[in-house]
Amino acid sequence: MDPNNAAASSAHDLSSLDLSCLNEAERIVINSFMRGPHAHFEHLGVGPNVKWDENLSKRAFYHLVAINHATLKLLVAQARLCSMQQMNAPNLTNGASATALGSLHPFSLGNPATSVTMASNPLANGPGLRTQLMAPDFALALLGNGTTPHASAGLGALNPGLYNPSASILGGPSSSGASSVLPSPSAHTPDAATDANHLPNPDPASGRQELTRAGRPARKKMKATALDAALRTEMPNWPSVQDDFVRWTRLAWFEAGFASTISDGAIGVQTRRPFSPFLTTTFAQVGVHLPSMSPNLLRAFNSWVDMHLRSLRDHFKGRIDKPHAGKASLAARSLEDTTFVSLTEFINNMCNSYNLINSELSVAAVRALCKLYLNVRNMATAKDSEGVLRVHIRDASNRQPPNILRGTLPQDREDDDLLTLITECGAIDFDLPTDTSDTMALAVLMVMSTSATTLTLDQAGCFSSLSGAASAQVNLLTNVTCEWFSVTMVTESGTSTISLPSSTRPSAHISAHGKDFALSWPKITEGLEIDIGLTLELQHNVTLDAYELRAKVVNHRPKAKASLWQLELNLRNVRQPEDGSAFFPAGYGVRYQGAFAASGSYPSSGATMQWMAAGGGAANEGQGLYLAAHDGYGYIKFLNAAAVEDVASLSIVYLVEDAGLPFAESTMPFPLTLAVVGGGDDLWYQAAQMYRTFALGEAQWMQAGRLHQRQDIPGWYVNNSIWINSGWQCHDIFNETQGDPHTVLNVTRRIRERFNTNMALHWYEWQQGPDANASARYRFDTHYPDYLPPRGGDYFGTVVRELEKEGVHIFPYINGRIFDVASTSYAQHNGSDHCCRKANPSFGAADQSFYVESYGSGSTFHTADPTDIYWQTTLADTVDALVNTYGVEGVYIDQLAAAAPTPDWTSWHNHTKGGGFYWRTGIVDIIKAMRQRVGPTVPLVTESNSEPYMDAISGFLTLVAFEPAFVGTKALVPAFPAIYGGYFVGFGDIFNAEDLADQDPLMARVVAQFVYGAQLGWFSLGGVTSGPDVDTSCGKMGEYDLWMSESSDAIVAAVEYYGNLRVCLLEYLAHGRILAPPSLSPAPAEFMAVETAVQNAGPFPSAMSAVWLHEDEASAVIIVAGVLDAGQTYNVSVDLTFSLPSLHDRQVTVQEMSCDGLSQQLDVMPANDIQIYDVTLSDRNARVYRVHFGA
């Protein structure tokens, strides 16, 4: 029988049905059937490409067809009954009507008047299954008889609560307290009278149904039905095991119609679910919750599943325990009577015993049998073996080398048997203890295995090993790691942090395919006055080939004074050898070697992204751990990483929404993702590509598109190469002339002429305030958010327009985050109402106070709530005036992406309290408010490159990104442009006056900006250069006179050269993305700055290099850039397949290019072995080589 035809033939003629009596989920089921069987399976979450001979076995596909055939029968019957009632049809009280409806009952595949068998059903090939399953009276029991107050509701009459395992299979109370809706005797077929004593009579007065046998509940009556008779026939001891049977089937893990969960104590563990996951998946896919389904319909589903799991349940449930008195278990018989020569024979024997066809077993069933086989074999050989048998098997295609064994194997294990295990079992991975013959003590370790990562947990849920596909022999963990997840609770008594797994063993469940698992602690708060449960799920992400951890905390006593504060995943004991490294996402990214400690609040300059990595080195065969929060909405969180003596730890802390407030349930709204990645010295790059896959696919901030797709990134802005600022000092030390319009006009004109290129001016100290007296001027970091009018009044606008005519684009400074408590606006607009309040961990988060900040100016600030409408409007007013009144082309709004969020617990603020993603949405709304005033084409930029603001912010001042050294044990790596290249604009670094006196460090900073794709400069023109106010920690910033000196001619020419080269390579450096770096031989020499009163004193490399991919991914450029004015020669080696695996086995064309349009072809080379010899650099120049990938 063709399954497609079977499903299609069951659809009947539905066009005349009245579907008004069906609920939403039921109408979806019928409508999907009308579209055809494959459309229906798509609704079921199976997918449109399901075929019996591909990813589903024929047996599983028939199960789906039969289940949905039964569903359709039920729904059609309900709709037709509704149609009859609406046509004033007589009550269904005669045999003919009953027979008519009986023909529609769910399991009647043939003549309704005859007993139904499953002989024609290819699924019913288990022993003894050719027996009557359902009689018409049972169908009427499902549908209602039309004579009770509930009958008009049909299948929807019963209480839509969850199934009660202690009730009968179809029993359960109604919403009015009545028993299940059962037909009256007159609704039976002619032999119904013999069954009359089993049926309740309606009591119109009470609306309840009475029982005709004293005190016997409705579920006992059902044992006299044909269904119960079938169960008795199949299982003579059914009365004694019914409750256990029903309970077990509710716990069964159901995959495509085949049971593959094994009971606790044998080869797996159980999970508690009110309905089979098949039903959950079925209706979750169409957006319908199970409680909205008719309870009888759900129960019919589950009853059908129960019956077809029966034979499998006999096989799996408790069959590996010790023999019980009076009967021998399957496991005992296997050990005593059978010698299993190979896994194949074992599987064949099991299939023959239960009439299962080996070739049609689902993958999950094969894996389950493999696990059972190993248990049996292990018990038979345990007395002769010691240690632990560890079996690591690759994916179903066996793409990796068959490196299977680790540890001690049973002596009789044969090589051909192991190869059979690979073939039959596919991608499974598990450990079995072989040091005991006590089968009840066998505790299978939970092991999740993908083609890239194998993660092993012991019986307590502790991480015991973490290894990658490159070598199963390498364990990235130095020790077993327990207490890797913690929950921080607050009560009236104080704060408690519970770390798990600990001595409290969880209940656990492994999925059928062996790649997902769940740990549950019903109560983690022993010894406390609260009752809190925790569930952790690790699920395999197929796209990323990684594991995603999800957490759910339940408060079983919501009225108790207890609340949740934060959740933390802390992976300790990560092996980081001396030659290994770690990555932390500050700025563009920092690579650490050796001991270190780093932390950052996300989103901020200290944690611009949400991922870390650690490991690498020869001992790890280049592999490391990737840990990330794959959160596409930007929830507030905290990242921490450290390493001591070759052991690293990585942790992510999630501040929960409404932290400290009463709660019933809290689910982490994003997964924490962990995986093993390769990469060796460039471990950071491979980890970055995994994060890039997530970000491009799920992150909200990617929706604005690439640079050329955005209106707020005009062409002149992308093409800009050099930035200057009017004068800035890191400790707010300014002289009087730095922001004066007359001074700014004069010095900017001359610098523009000196560099002979367009540039952007970041203008500080432009504000005056309402008092025109110089002594009353609003100085830097005072009076925020009050700025206007500007210094010089209308003359400020005149200077702006004059400079813009000469090719200088003006970006005045404002602050978007802090509120001066001494400002006029704070006093006039109840400033405290618009500011954030912090809370110490406490129940109710009642202990609140303002965040207080102060900088070099001495003013006191509170942090404004970015979601506050007043704050958004006030900032938009200022930007409106600057653009539309004074003519600036862009505005710099400080701190938005640099400063850490200040979680807010103010009760009347319109966002979640404490945790949440409101910080991102608030800042995005600030920018939206500004754009409503100035239009979409004005660049609005801020400090630092925090990812979640990319869709709103036009560019980022990258001071923090370029703060680390470029080589050494704490070095900048361009992870951010490796992920987001082509989607953002970065500009700027801190340059000191000392850098111009010692020109090589300045040139190193400029070259770093160039090779990493940023716009150059941010040279500070004004500043205090002498006297007691000179900044001795950050260095002198006033550089104008030095730039204009003849002694700087060479360095000016070099900066101009790299600025022009950047414009020439914009299609790569701005619109493309950076790849893994090339290798230079010999390694460039390193040097330190002569002057040390600067933030980055080195070490600096004498040359830097990079590979950039074009946006169309058809070519790349290899850049080698000189820092020193002395000659240097290098050989360059590039393996493009490391970054672009699609180029494997490809030949590429390499040519040296120049910006004058001339190029010289070098050779055709393998993409994985590009060699360019004798690359000579002189006079701080660069060599550029274009690589064409070809067809």
Curated annotation (Swiss-Prot):
Residues 173-187 have a biased composition (Low complexity). InterPro entries: DUF6259. GO terms for molecular function: hydrolase activity, acting on glycosyl bonds. The keyword Acetylation does not apply. Its EC number is 3.2.1.-. The keyword Glycoprotein does not apply. Belongs to the glycoside hydrolase-like 3 (GHL3) family. It comes from the Eukaryota. Keywords: Glycosidase, Hydrolase. The lineage of its organism: Eukaryota, Choanoflagellata, Craspedida, Salpingoecidae, Monosiga. Signal peptide: none annotated. Residues 173-221 are annotated as: Disordered. This is Putative glycoside hydrolase 22789. It is an enzyme of class 3 (hydrolase).
